Every structure is written in C-alpha cells, then in structure tokens.
C-alpha cells in the first residue's frame, strides 16, 4: 500500500503564533479574548461542542489548530435563518460542515419512523435542536451567509450519502448529498488526512475546484479528464452477440484500409517475407482507472442496478487496490477518489494526544449532555472494523484496516482522565472502539492485505491470513489496571466473540478483571438464513464463547452474565426464523424487553438488500436469487413480537401467525410451548424502559426490572435508571446503602418518640445520622 504524507510533517500556518485555545471559540467575545480578528476555518456541527476525542468536531478542530489555523465552532445553530451562521464572521479559508456524530435522520427517528423524544448530543437531552438532513441544510445556510466561501462537507451523514443512496424515510433513491447540498467538496470516512491537505492547499491560494487529487474526497466535474481509462459498469452483464475475434496482428486503425486492399484482389507472394508489426495495447493502471457506475436516473428506476452499484462500491473500499468511481447526476458527474490511506500508530497518537479539555464548552453551564456522560471516562484505543456486518456502516466509514494507538498513548490518556476529568471515581468505563477486541489484529501479509477484496475477514470463517493474537490487548489491560488511582477497567464495547474464542487467555483475562456484571455480545440471530445475509457467525460460536465465559466466571468466583442482543426483521429473515429464535430465547431463559428492528441506514449492504430484494454479496443479475424482505409494518411488528414472546400484548398476533404457519402446537401452557392459549385477565406486563414511547418531557419510569429479563437498549446494555445511572455502578450501591441507613434512623426515631423503648423493651439507642 502506498504511503501518505504524515500529518505532523506539514508546515505550520502563520497563525500558529496564537497557540492552542482552552476551547475552540463559539462567539466573537471568545475570539477577542484570544486576540483573533477572524477565523481561518469555521466548523458547523449538529452536536453540542464537547472538547473530547470522541466527538468529531473536536478532533477535526484541534487537528486544524495544530496545523496553525484559527478554528471556530458553530454548534447546533438555528437553521431557520442565516444569522447564526454569521456570528463568527466570514472564515478566511472555508466552512467545514457536519451533521454530527450520527446521521441526523437516525438521530431523530426510530426504526419504525417515530420521532424520538430526546437527543443524546444536545444539552439536557432535548430533541429538535437540529434539522432533518442537517448536512444539507447547514451547507445551504453557509452558502447563503457567505456566497463565495468554499464549503467542505464531512462527517458520517455526508460520508454515507456521498453516492446515490436509498433513503428509508422517503422510500426512494436520493441524489448524492454533494449535489443537493451546494458544497464544493466532500470528505468521506475518517477525514484527518483529507482535511489537512485541503486546508493547506487553500492556505496557499489554490482554488477549491482545482483540488481533485486528494484521496477520500468526492467532488463534481463535467467529464472524465484526459489520461484516464474508464471502465463501464453501468449495466449488468447479460448474454448477447459474440463479436468475431480480430486478428491480433492487424493494426485496428487501418482495418478499413486493409479491407479495401483485400477487395482489390491482390495476391501476395508466399515466398516474400513480411515484417509483422505488433501494436502495444494501452496499459490500464489503477491510479488512472475510474469505474463508471450506473447513473442516478438508472438506479432510481431499477432496483437491481442499485444493488449492482452497491456491490461495485463495496468492492472498491480497500485503500490498497481501490479505483476511483464516477456516477452521472444529470449533466454532471460526481467523482469519488479512492479511500484515504489508514493512519499509522504515530499519527493516531498525534491525533489523540492533542490538548483536549475533555469537557463540554463552558457556554452550556451545568446542563448535562447525555452522550458526553456516557463516554467521559472511556478511552478509544483503535479505529476500523473488519467484521463487515451488512447492517452496520462502521466498515464503510472507518475502513476494514485496524488503526491502532500505542500502549503509551493510551496509558497517558487514562492518566489524564484520572488527573483532569471532574467526577472520576477510579473506574474507566470502556477501553475499546468499534469492537472491543480487534486491537493490533491484522492480516499476516501486507501484500495480501493490499490485494484483498473480501468484504469480511471473519465470515464465513476466520481468514487463515488473519493474525488473531490477543497478547497486545492483554498486556494493555494489565498495564492500565496497574495504574495508581485506577480501581477498575471495564470493557463496554461490543465483543467479537468468534475472535475471542481463538484466545482463551484473553477470555480469561476479560472475564476475571474487566466485566462489570454484564458483558454485551451480538449473536443477532440463531438461524442460518438471516445470519448469512448479515455476515455473522453461526450460533455455535456463541455457545462456545458462553461455555468459556461461564467457566472463567466460576473460577473467578463472580456472578456475571452475558447480554446477547438480536435484530428483528433483517433482510433474509422469515417468520419461521423468528419463531425458531423465540423458541431458542425461551429455552435459554432469555426475556428480551427492548428490541431493535432492522434500520436501513444509507449505503449499508443490508439496505441495498432491503431496497432491491437482491444480495449484493454475490454477483447481481436480474435472475439471481431473491432475498426475503420484511417491509410491511404488520410483519415488522410480528417479528418484534416473536422476540418479546413473553409480552401479553403480542400474544394475539403470535397466535394468529403460529396457526397460519401450521404451528398451533406451540400455543399452550407447556414449557416447550411458546405462548399461552388465553390472554391474562389484566395486562400486568410493563416495559422496564419506555423511552421513545412516552411524550417528550415525560419522566415516567416503569417498575424495577425483574432479574430474569434482558432489558437491552439499542446499545445492548441494560436499561438506565431514571437518573441515567448504570445498574452495576458503585455509586448506585452507595446510594442504596445511604437510603437503608436513613430508613433505619427514621424507624429508631419513631420508636424513641413512642416511649423510648427499642426492641424487646430495651431503651432505644440514639439515632445515627447518616453521613
């Protein structure tokens, strides 16, 4: 794989003399205090500004600041007018626009298209502080505010909408967001390299329209430039006329002339020697090859072509062998350069080692930002995921190659949290990333890695070229928990259990020291049909890991539980599959409360299946096998009801479905039967977590969850209490103990008031006031 210029090798911009700001400014008053007369770059984001490396605007802002640029932040502006977009003045170089850490549509709507009642990235968790399709709206307002200032579009929303994409909320294929947003250039994936290169070039006076050779960018152009070889992939191959094989020794440019000479009937002398001229065919080099995808008009009207385009796109995601792509949108082309080169360990350390304040901007006062509260004591140790799950967009956004931080950098960040972050109690809530256990796991051969086009390194089985050694991660865990002032290191990121079982030593280390009562894992299903479409391992891998987990838990003398979570209504899932999953859940004693239905997010492979009914994991043709799709609201409710087989509200629907499927034998009181024959006299079931089902502003909380239930959020964790706490949090234990002491003291005071007698007629002891 080709190398890239290191992030720390660029010359600094002249404004470096101002030094790093305590916080990137959000107002003119803050700019004045810093001595700035203007911003070089202004970042507009749909999230509240938290100066922490888990928030995209903080990473990009601090990175640009480290290059010497003066960077301002406009967080969650009022998009109804251009006024908020002008409050920091006109930027000298460009506006950087992002919707935030989440796609704005997924952030606002549930998988059933219901409006969410909260927003974790907003102070107070308040919903409604960002528009739908925020990247598009913000870009248009920036252009309205300052017409001639370039707009650089980035973030996960823009990244996953860079190509013509199926939009679940409108149920149609939309243009590339670059067309609708009026932006000048789009940066996709983790954009550190691209944003620094673009900023540096603009600072040298280059025009934004001339920046067309930066990896990880998309832009609009009129036609294919000279010197490029275009591969036409606008149609699906089909049987047709086979052309006559041309004589390879004939100069094709002179074929017509040869035909004329032959018509003259001249007879050549067989004894006369002739010089044969062999013409070199034009060589197709990867660096100058572009693949033309079907146009937006074609994929909008032909779902099979859409699936074909999705397949080609995903085959061109390896930075080592990816070629440029181009897609026609009306009269213009949207051009996609190959993905960015992954960052080295030194560069990852550089990015995560910048002077983050690690707290929200002071402008928010004491208002809590739920997303920050969730991650303020967590540490990101790597990026990327080679799992390739078709319903997930992490691989499309962060890449398949794992980008690791050094152990020294991670330890420094833990020490910084210990010494700097308010409220630290000695517990690191997570040491992970997109997955918990892919740290320093990679292909054994860089050459093979650069040439590979497989969508997953672990499906249908673990690739023999994948190094599954967990020793670096084990050493990191041991070093982290040995730090003074650190009481506990928890692992809250999702565990890839099919990888973990390859290293029993790792499972033992994890279970013995790093599980806080619950460990979340994601089998997603039990049946082969949906698992194959998800590219997830069979349930046998889960069973193997469960045995190891229980063995090492028992050896450690602990009481710990696995929290498996599942997806309903995923492409490839039949009613019978969901029935079998429900039987498995009941047989294993699981009662899932909060259920996640499949959410068709932009650009995901499973979304292409959902829209087209075809499987882009294989060659797509009009006659290729169809994929079972669950689209109707009624069937989606049925699949969720199977997962919540214990909820009486779903029993009438399940009875009708089981009778229709010829499985009425599963209706009855037996332990091997799924649901009772009759409804209860009163509905006693109540969800332990009713988020998104209560009106905005309501703070009702259900009854305490029973220990036999699995109450899972979309993260797979048990539900939070009314105050946002976690069940295993030590603070909750202390609070419960204090309440018990209060009750005991109150009882003793009452006894004293009644006659000064305690138990057995003895004088009551003086009440103890709890501290």
Curated annotation (Swiss-Prot):
Extract one GO molecular function annotation from the record: iron ion binding
Gene3D superfamilies per record: tm_1862 like domain
Top-rank lineage group of the source organism: Bacteria
- Biased composition, Basic and acidic residues: where in the chain? 726-735, 745-754
Q: Where does [4Fe-4S] cluster bind?
A: 385, 389, 392
Matching entries from InterPro entries are given as: Elp3/MiaA/NifB-like_rSAM, Methylthiotransferase_CS, rSAM, rSAM_horseshoe, UPF0313, UPF0313_C, UPF0313_N
- For region Disordered, the annotated ranges are 683-771
Q: Where is the composition biased (Basic residues)?
A: 756-765
Alphabetized, the UniProt keywords read: 4Fe-4S, Iron, Iron-sulfur, Metal-binding, S-adenosyl-L-methionine
Which cofactors does the annotated protein need, by name?
[4Fe-4S] cluster
Q: How is the cofactor bound?
A: Binds 1 [4Fe-4S] cluster. The cluster is coordinated with 3 cysteines and an exchangeable S-adenosyl-L-methionine.
Q: Which residues form the Radical SAM core domain?
A: 371-649
Spell out the family assignment given in the record's similarity comment.
Belongs to the UPF0313 family.
Designated name of the protein: UPF0313 protein PSPTO_4928
State the organism of origin. Answer: Pseudomonas syringae pv. tomato (strain ATCC BAA-871 / DC3000)
């Amino acid at each position: 794989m080709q190398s890239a210029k290191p992030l720390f090798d660029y010359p600094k911009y002249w404004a470096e003399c101002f030094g790093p700001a305590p916080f990137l400014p959000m107002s003119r008053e803050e700019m004045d205090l810093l001595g700035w007369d203007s911003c070089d770059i202004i970042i507009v984001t749909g999230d509240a500004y938290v100066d922490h490396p888990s928030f995209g605007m903080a990473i990009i802002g601090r990175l640009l600041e480290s290059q010497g640029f003066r960077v301002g932040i406009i967080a969650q502006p009022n998009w109804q007018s251009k006024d908020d977009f002008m409050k920091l003045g006109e930027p000298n170089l460009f506006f950087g626009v992002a919707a935030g850490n989440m796609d704005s549509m997924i952030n606002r709507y549930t998988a059933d298209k219901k409006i969410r009642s909260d927003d974790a990235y907003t102070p107070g968790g308040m919903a409604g502080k960002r528009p739908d399709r925020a990247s598009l709206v913000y870009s248009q307002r920036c252009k309205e505010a300052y017409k001639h200032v370039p707009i650089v579009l980035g973030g996960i929303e823009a990244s996953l909408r860079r190509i013509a994409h199926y939009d679940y909320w409108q149920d149609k294929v939309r243009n590339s967001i670059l067309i609708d947003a009026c932006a000048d250039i789009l940066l996709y994936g983790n954009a550190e390299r691209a944003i620094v290169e673009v900023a540096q070039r603009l600072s040298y006076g280059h025009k934004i329209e001339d920046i067309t050779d930066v990896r990880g960018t998309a832009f609009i152009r009129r036609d294919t430039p000279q010197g490029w070889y275009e591969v036409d992939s606008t149609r699906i191959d089909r049987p047709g006329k086979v052309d006559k094989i041309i004589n390879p020794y004939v100069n094709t440019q002179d074929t017509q002339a040869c035909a004329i000479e032959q018509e003259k009937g001249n007879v050549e002398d067989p004894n006369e020697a002739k010089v044969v001229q062999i013409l070199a065919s034009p060589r197709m080099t990867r660096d100058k090859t572009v693949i033309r995808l079907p146009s937006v008009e074609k994929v909008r009207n032909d779902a099979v072509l859409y699936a074909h385009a999705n397949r080609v796109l995903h085959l061109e995601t390896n930075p080592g062998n990816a070629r440029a792509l181009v897609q026609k949108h009306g009269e213009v082309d949207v051009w996609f350069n190959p993905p960015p080169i992954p960052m080295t360990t030194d560069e990852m350390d550089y990015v995560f080692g910048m002077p983050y304040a690690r707290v929200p901007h002071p402008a928010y006062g004491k208002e809590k930002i739920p997303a920050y509260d969730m991650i303020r004591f967590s540490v990101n140790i790597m990026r990327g995921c080679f799992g390739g799950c078709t319903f997930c967009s992490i691989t499309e956004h962060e890449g398949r190659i794992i980008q690791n931080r050094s152990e020294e950098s991670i330890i420094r960040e833990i020490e910084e949290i210990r010494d700097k972050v308010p409220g630290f109690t000695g517990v690191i809530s997570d040491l992970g990333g997109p997955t918990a256990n892919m740290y320093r796991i990679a292909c054994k051969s860089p050459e093979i890695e650069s040439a590979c086009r497989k969508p997953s390194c672990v499906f249908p089985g673990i690739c023999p070229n994948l190094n599954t050694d967990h020793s670096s991660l084990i050493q990191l865990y041991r070093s982290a928990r040995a730090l003074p002032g650190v009481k506990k290191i928890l692992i809250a990121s999702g565990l890839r259990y099919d990888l973990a079982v390859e290293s029993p030593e790792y499972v033992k280390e994890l279970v013995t020291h790093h599980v806080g009562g619950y460990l979340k894992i994601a089998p997603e299903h039990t049946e082969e049909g949906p698992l194959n479409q998800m590219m997830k391992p069979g349930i046998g891998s889960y069973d193997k890991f469960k045995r190891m987990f229980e063995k090492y838990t028992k050896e450690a003398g602990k009481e710990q539980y696995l929290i498996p979570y599942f997806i309903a209504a995923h492409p490839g899932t039949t009613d019978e599959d969901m029935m079998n999953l429900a039987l498995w859940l009941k047989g294993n004693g699981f009662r899932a409360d909060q259920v996640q239905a499949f959410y068709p997010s932009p650009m995901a492979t499973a979304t292409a299946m959902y829209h087209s009914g075809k499987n882009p994991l294989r060659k797509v043709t009009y006659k290729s096998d169809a994929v079972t799709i669950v689209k109707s609201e009624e069937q989606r409710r049925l699949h969720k009801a199977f997962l919540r087989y214990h909820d009486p509200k779903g029993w009438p629907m399940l009875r009708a479905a089981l009778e229709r499927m010829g499985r009425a034998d599963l209706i009855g009181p037996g332990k091997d039967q799924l649901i009772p024959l009759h409804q209860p006299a009163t509905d006693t079931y109540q969800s332990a977590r009713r988020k998104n089902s209560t009106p905005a502003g309501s703070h009702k909380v259900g009854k305490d969850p029973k220990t036999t239930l699995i109450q899972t959020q979309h993260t797979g964790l048990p539900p939070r209490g009314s105050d946002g706490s976690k069940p295993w949090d030590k603070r909750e234990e202390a609070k419960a103990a204090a309440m018990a002491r209060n009750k005991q003291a109150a009882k003793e005071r009452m006894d004293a008031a009644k006659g000064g007698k305690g138990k057995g007629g003895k004088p009551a002891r003086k009440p103890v006031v709890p501290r």
